[in-house]
């Protein structure tokens, strides 16, 4: 306080008067300073980074429950050789799935009272361990109200002292005798899960392919501390929820392609009956062979009749999508995407695609809804169909709830504890300089580009209908999905038409932007970090997802001398044949940075019944010789500022500039 004088705080008096309402006396302000100083010297909480979950809700939920192997590690540390491996496995499974595991135990256990006594004591030990790096206040806020007092007593009493040992045993025995053991065990297990992960970062792509994006969003909406950096698939769904019909068509097409209807129908109550009726009528005699869904990634078993219907719906929505996208491209010549309007290059009579002077035979030649003289015009039936589907998307309450969550906790990028998080790319030129991208009348690049696109995505959803700004933003959200200079995409094109209709694979090629090659260079990564206000150093990193790391071919997730980490390891089953693994979690705790590599998750049922955990391999990316404390984090910087303000308030009290309120 030595350098704070009454003169130096005169200009801060209005703010200090407001602060004095929360801390009305010298004693209150002093106590808060002591509390904050104590917090600064605790170990930093554990951050978990996940990316490209793609609707794989069971694997996602399991990784949250087992904290990427941290719970198992702690159980091993605590019980070591005092328990058999099978017993430690039982404790872990109970912590992950308390309700389901309790059900099984009750069917098998002969002496339930004894089991309760042993298990509750074991859970108390685990809970004491995971809560030890937090203040009592923080732990208290995480406690379920009905058991708050009892859990606090159990956590903060040592069972080594004989008197206290008896006290703890009485509490546990009473929990059992009052038939509250089940509820108490569930509460303890959930608390252990919650305290093991302090904060969760989702670096994009919750949606697409897998069956349960809506279940993942439900989990996140109730999660205690998380943030999201939007991925291209998330943005596509946000565009659909904002009312962009091209985005809506894309979302439905992807669902049909992977035969995953659960998110649309069960999750969001989207009525697909109009599409089914239209597809059955329009393509009644059409085998639609090339539109058969990829069944090895489907969310359910379908009979032949249903599969036939999904195939017809897939074709119907794909044709509609190509027309809707052409409308945006014509309306927005500034997007520079004329090369994605391709239907007028089709000779429908001869069934060939004429591209750059060369003819390519089409894989499908039946287009009853396309008028060769005006190929981009929606038929009256197609327009009516899109009107009905649009209305269904706009009226889904569950979708509105999830979108609010994505907007509240999400953004295009995040800087957190010297780490820069974004899903895909920051567009670059070949020389490594930032690419200037024109949006409207201005050019944006680097950080400004990501901020501008973030703002446009929000405008598309929240702005009043009818304004020019809203209409442009709505169109731009679609550009963010497939536009060449979109930071969430950054390829020369999305070859949707060619991949469906042309067999020649030379036309399927999508060339990635310069970023994806240049991000291997440390100098380029340093320049990007500086652009986003992160000082390059040994503990500064860029964290990306988006491009699956082909571990099976020897590709490494750690790039540019450790400055950049790509943590898309294939949560999505569709990518696991490419990656050879089933996802990464990056874990950043007080001892350093670890990359956890997961093998495929069998199923929730096997985890509960057989105690099957995800097999994970931990790679140490960085080891801190000294433990990282809260004072070394962004939160620590905030607390230091609060302490300085409270110090000023103390000076104001002690010099009479502000009077204490008794």
Q: Predicted regions span which residues?
A:
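Feature recognizes metal-dependent phosphohydrolase scaffolds
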Residues: 1-662
């Amino acid at each position: 306080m030595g350098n704070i004088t009454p003169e130096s705080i005169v200009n801060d008096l209005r703010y200090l008067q407001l602060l004095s309402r929360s801390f009305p006396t010298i004693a209150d302000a002093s106590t808060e300073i002591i509390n904050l100083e104590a917090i600064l010297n605790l170990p930093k909480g554990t951050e978990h980074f996940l990316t490209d979950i793609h609707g794989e809700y069971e694997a996602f939920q399991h990784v949250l429950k087992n904290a990427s192997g941290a719970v198992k590690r702690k159980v091993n540390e605590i019980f070591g050789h005092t328990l058999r491996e099978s017993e430690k496995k039982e404790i872990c499974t109970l912590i992950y799935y308390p309700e389901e595991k309790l059900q099984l135990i009750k069917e098998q256990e002969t002496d339930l009272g004894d089991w309760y006594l042993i298990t509750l004591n074991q859970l108390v030990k685990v809970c004491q361990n995971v809560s030890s790096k937090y203040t009592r206040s923080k732990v208290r806020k995480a406690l379920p109200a009905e058991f708050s007092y009892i859990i606090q007593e159990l956590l903060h009493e040592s069972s080594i002292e004989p008197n206290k040992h008896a006290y703890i045993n009485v509490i546990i025995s009473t929990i059992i005798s009052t038939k509250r053991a089940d509820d108490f065990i569930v509460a303890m297990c959930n608390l252990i899960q919650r305290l093991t992960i302090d904060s969760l970062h989702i670096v994009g792509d919750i949606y697409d392919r897998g069956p349960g994006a809506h279940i993942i969003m439900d989990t996140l909406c109730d999660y205690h501390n998380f943030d999201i950096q939007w991925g291209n698939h998330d943005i596509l769904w946000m565009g659909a929820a904002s009312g962009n019909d091209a985005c809506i068509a894309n979302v439905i097409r992807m669902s049909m392609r992977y035969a995953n209807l659960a998110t649309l129908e069960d999750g969001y109550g989207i009525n697909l009956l109009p599409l089914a009726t239209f597809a059955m009528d329009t393509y009644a005699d059409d085998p639609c062979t090339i539109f058969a869904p990829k069944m090895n990634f489907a969310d359910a078993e379908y009979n032949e009749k249903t599969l036939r219907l999904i195939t017809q719906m897939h074709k119907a929505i794909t044709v509609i999508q190509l027309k809707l996208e052409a409308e945006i491209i014509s309306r927005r010549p500034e997007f520079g995407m004329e090369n994605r309007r391709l239907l007028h290059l089709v000779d429908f009579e001869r069934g060939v695609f004429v591209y750059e002077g060369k003819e390519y035979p089409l894989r499908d030649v039946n287009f009853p809804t396309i008028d060769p003289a005006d190929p981009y015009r929606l038929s009256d039936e197609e327009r009516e169909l899109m009107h009905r589907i649009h209305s269904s998307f706009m009226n889904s309450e569950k979708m509105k709830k999830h979108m609010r969550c994505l907007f509240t906790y999400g953004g295009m990028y995040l800087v957190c504890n010297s780490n820069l998080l974004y899903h895909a790319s920051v567009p670059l030129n070949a020389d490594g300089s930032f690419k200037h991208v024109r949006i409207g009348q201005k050019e944006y690049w680097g950080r400004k580009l990501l901020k501008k696109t973030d703002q446009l995505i929000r405008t598309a959803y929240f702005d009043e209908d009818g304004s020019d700004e809203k209409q442009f933003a709505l169109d731009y959200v679609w550009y963010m999905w497939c536009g060449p200079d979109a930071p969430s995409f950054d390829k020369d094109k999305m070859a949707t038409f060619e991949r469906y209709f042309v067999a020649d694979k030379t036309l399927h090629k999508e060339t990635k932007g310069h970023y994806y090659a240049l991000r291997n260079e440390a100098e380029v990564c340093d320049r990007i970090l500086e652009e986003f206000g992160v000082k390059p150093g040994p503990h500064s990193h860029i964290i990306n997802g988006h491009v699956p790391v082909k571990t099976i071919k020897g590709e490494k997730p750690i790039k540019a001398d450790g400055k950049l980490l790509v943590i898309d390891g294939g949560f999505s089953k569709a990518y696991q044949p490419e990656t050879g693994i089933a996802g990464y979690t990056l874990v950043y705790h007080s001892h350093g940075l670890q990359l956890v590599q997961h093998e495929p998750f069998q199923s929730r049922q096997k985890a509960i019944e057989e105690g099957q955990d995800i097999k994970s391999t931990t790679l140490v990316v960085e080891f801190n010789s000294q433990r990282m404390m809260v004072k070394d984090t962004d939160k620590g910087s905030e607390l230091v500022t609060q302490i300085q303000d409270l110090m000023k308030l103390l000076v104001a009290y002690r010099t009479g500039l502000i009077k204490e309120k008794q």
